[in-house]
């Protein structure tokens, strides 16, 4: 009997060892690349690429175009123009159920479509990405929850953002730095319009730097009223938050060092995936760029 029990125990231990070894040997089947690094902002992803932490950064085209074309910091890097990821649209988000607040944001964007919206976009080189028109329909026009009234009564609105030029960035250094950007200027214009139309006294928006991966939680617990920072609209985000109408077009792009062109530059996405098999990829955690690398959920 003891001998039989010993044999059974040996078999069980052997099976457990095989399972453990298999688990230790498991790898994530990324869409491309062998390793994925995540950081707290898209700017950090670019900086990580520059430091040599990764071979490829995946970020928003809106941001990539700005840094590649308007600064010297990344003059030795390039966008892989022929590698096409999914095209996207940006939206503004509030806590789930706060449709009345988002409705007022929509209303203002539509009203400003031919004025401030275009003027601000022109300032930051984003006129070709604009999506709102004067005849755009506000899908939340009938919303009547208390979220807008709360902002009116509090006389303040707190907006969460990350540094993400030309959407939101510091112009200048140290104490002289000024927060500017397309979304920053647009948010101010929207609140100014709403104050004028509804005779409200909401102060100029308060902008708070957030951990992008915590944006939903920060909306839910009331730390911020809005996420207004080039947020890609997805079905999951529309399910978990109240999201505005699309206001800016975007797509995800791959950034590499120009010196690595021979290694990663391809004529299409499929060719890029093959070339990037052994690459280390860096993205902002919780971003659309991360979803371009992670395997699709089954």
Question: PLM features: residue spans?
Answer:
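Bilobed "Venus flytrap"/periplasmic-binding protein-like clamshell domains
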Residues: 26-46, 61-65, 99, 163-165, ...
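Residues embedded in well-ordered beta-strands
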Residues: 91-93, 158, 253-255
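Extended ligand-binding regions for polar small-molecule ligands
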Residues: 84-138, 184, 191-193, 258-270, ...
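Positively charged n-region of N-terminal signal peptides that target proteins for export
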Residues: 1-9
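Extracytoplasmic small-molecule ligand-binding "clamshell" domains
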Residues: 35-42, 47-51, 60, 105, ...
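Acidic, polar ligand-binding/catalytic clefts
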Residues: 68-87, 164-166, 188, 199-273
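Sec-dependent signal peptide cleavage junction
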Residues: 15-30
């Amino acid at each position: 009997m003891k001998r039989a029990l010993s044999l059974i125990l040996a078999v069980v231990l052997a099976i457990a060892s095989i399972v453990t070894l298999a688990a230790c040997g498991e790898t994530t089947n990324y869409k491309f690349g062998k390793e994925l690094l995540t950081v707290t902002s898209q700017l950090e992803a670019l900086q990580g690429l520059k430091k040599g932490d990764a071979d490829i950064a995946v970020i928003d085209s809106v941001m990539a175009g700005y840094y590649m074309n308007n600064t010297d910091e990344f003059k030795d890097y390039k966008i892989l123009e022929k590698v096409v990821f999914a095209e996207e649209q940006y939206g503004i988000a509030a806590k789930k159920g706060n449709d009345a607040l988002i409705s007022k944001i929509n209303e203002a964007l539509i009203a400003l479509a031919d004025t401030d919206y275009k003027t601000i976009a022109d300032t930051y080189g984003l006129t070709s990405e604009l999506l709102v028109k004067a005849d755009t329909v506000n899908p939340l026009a009938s919303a009547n929850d208390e979220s807008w009234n709360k902002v009116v009564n509090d006389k303040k609105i707190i907006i969460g953002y990350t540094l993400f030029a030309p959407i939101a960035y510091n112009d200048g250094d140290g104490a002289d730095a000024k927060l500017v950007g397309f979304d920053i200027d647009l948010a101010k214009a929207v609140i100014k319009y709403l104050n004028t139309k509804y005779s409200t006294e909401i102060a100029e928006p308060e902008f708070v730097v957030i951990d992008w991966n915590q944006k939903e939680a920060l909306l839910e617990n009331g730390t911020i009223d809005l996420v207004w920072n080039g947020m890609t609209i997805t079905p999951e985000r529309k399910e978990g938050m109240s999201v505005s109408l699309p206001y800016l077009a975007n797509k995800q792009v791959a950034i590499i060092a120009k010196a690595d062109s021979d290694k990663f530059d391809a004529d299409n996405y499929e060719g890029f995936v093959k070339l990037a098999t052994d690459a280390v990829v860096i993205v902002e955690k919780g971003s659309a760029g991360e979803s371009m690398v992670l395997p699709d959920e089954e």
